[in-house]
Regions:
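Interfacial aromatic "cap" segments that immediately flank transmembrane helices
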Residues: 16-46, 84-115, 127-178, 208, ...
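Midchain, well-structured core segments that form catalytic/ion-binding scaffolds
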Residues: 50
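Selective recognition of hydrophobic, aromatic-rich stretches within alpha-helical transmembrane segments
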Residues: 2-9, 13, 53-85, 113-150, ...
Length: 215
């Protein structure tokens, strides 16, 4: 990681053009639509299987969910940078290089958000929105979990309200996906990831990093 380059990235001004990123997210999803939907089905099935196992089913999903779901970030970054990908790339988050940091991002970020919610709600909402880029920062800049959380918070804070509105609309889209007999979520959830990663990549993407090429 080049600390000076990252510091410069965190000082960038940017605007969140909601219409642009919904369109760009959809355009990015199309080349990987089948694999992406298949990956989310795999996540769903893994959670169903784990949930059926006594004791383990109460712990394992929480441990592996963040590293597993982060796989879509690797693939979307590869597509945006004109790189090829294989289905196995969806599971890069489970590798030794990334697993612990991604798990800690989920654990610590989640705990801080919950604490914020307990203190008058608003701090929790602020942190929930602020940490939206933590996973992309971790895998793209090889950051440790707290560095990734802080990098995301600093960047989002420059246009927090715009990012908040984007996430509200993404949330509404996913609610609509659930209302469509529950199956629509397998389209809206991958699209949500594409939208968020497209925005991240335009603002802070580390195009010199080979994370999207190496396990």
């Amino acid at each position: 990681m080049n600390a000076n380059e990252l510091d410069a990235v965190l000082q960038r001004d940017y605007e969140v053009d909601i219409s642009k990123y919904f369109k760009k997210g959809w355009a990015t999803l199309q080349p990987c639509f089948g694999p992406m939907v298949g990956f989310f089905l795999v996540i769903f099935l893994i959670n169903v299987v784990l949930a059926s196992i006594p004791v383990v089913g109460k712990i394992a999903p929480g441990v592996i969910y963040a590293p597993l779901s982060a796989g879509s970030t690797f693939v979307v970054l590869a597509i945006l940078r004109g790189q090829s990908f294989e289905f196995k790339d969806f599971f890069k988050g489970l590798s030794n290089k990334y697993f612990l940091q991604l798990f800690l991002i989920s654990l610590v970020g989640g705990l801080l958000t919950i604490v914020g919610v307990l203190f008058f709600l608003i701090p929790g909402i602020y942190l929930f929105v602020s940490y939206v880029f933590a996973v992309p920062f971790a895998v793209d800049w090889d950051l440790e979990f707290f560095q990734a959380l802080e990098a995301s918070r600093k960047l989002v804070s420059r246009q927090w309200l715009q990012v908040f509105v984007l996430l509200i609309l993404i949330g509404l889209m996913n609610i609509l996906g659930l209302l469509l007999l529950g199956v629509g979520i397998f389209v809206t959830a991958p699209l949500s990831i594409c939208i968020i990663v497209c925005l991240y990549n335009d603002i802070a993407g580390n195009t010199l990093n080979s994370a999207t090429e190496e396990a």
